[in-house]
């Protein structure tokens, strides 16, 4: 019996911290409809992701995927940098 291919979760967000070695903090924003009033409100989540080459900088838009736990709080890995932040 063949194993079914498990779909890998991928998310896109913005890097808000790159101070840790080989780790970035990514802010994921989503819009959720309020259950009573019906207005769409922004909700956000911060996730730690593994950045093996330390290539990300603050403000970059990145794509991350779920992976095995790397540490207590880190279970996501960097897939690609979608858009670089503007240098000031």
UniProtKB/Swiss-Prot annotation:
CDD domains: Ribosomal_uS17
UniProt KW keywords: Ribonucleoprotein, Ribosomal protein, RNA-binding, rRNA-binding
Pfam families xrefs: Ribosomal_S17
GO molecular function: rRNA binding; structural constituent of ribosome
InterPro entries on file: NA-bd_OB-fold, Ribosomal_uS17, Ribosomal_uS17_bact/chlr
GO CC, alphabetical: cytosolic small ribosomal subunit
Subunit text: Part of the 30S ribosomal subunit.
PANTHER family: 40S RIBOSOMAL PROTEIN S11 FAMILY MEMBER (PTHR10744), SMALL RIBOSOMAL SUBUNIT PROTEIN US17M (PTHR10744:SF1)
Function recorded in the entry: One of the primary rRNA binding proteins, it binds specifically to the 5'-end of 16S ribosomal RNA.
Similarity remark: Belongs to the universal ribosomal protein uS17 family.
This protein's name: Small ribosomal subunit protein uS17
Organism of provenance: Stutzerimonas stutzeri (strain A1501) (Pseudomonas stutzeri)
Organism ancestry: Bacteria, Pseudomonadati, Pseudomonadota, Gammaproteobacteria, Pseudomonadales
Gene: rpsQ
């Amino acid at each position: 019996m063949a194993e079914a291919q498990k779909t890998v979760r991928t998310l896109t967000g913005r890097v808000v911290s790159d101070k840790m070695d080989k780790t970035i903090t990514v802010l994921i924003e989503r819009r959720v409809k309020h259950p009573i009033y019906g207005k769409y409100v922004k909700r956000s989540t911060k996730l730690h992701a593994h950045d093996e080459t330390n290539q990300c900088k603050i403000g970059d838009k990145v794509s991350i995927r779920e992976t095995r736990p790397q540490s207590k709080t880190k279970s996501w890995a960097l897939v690609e940098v979608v858009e670089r932040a503007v240098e000031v």
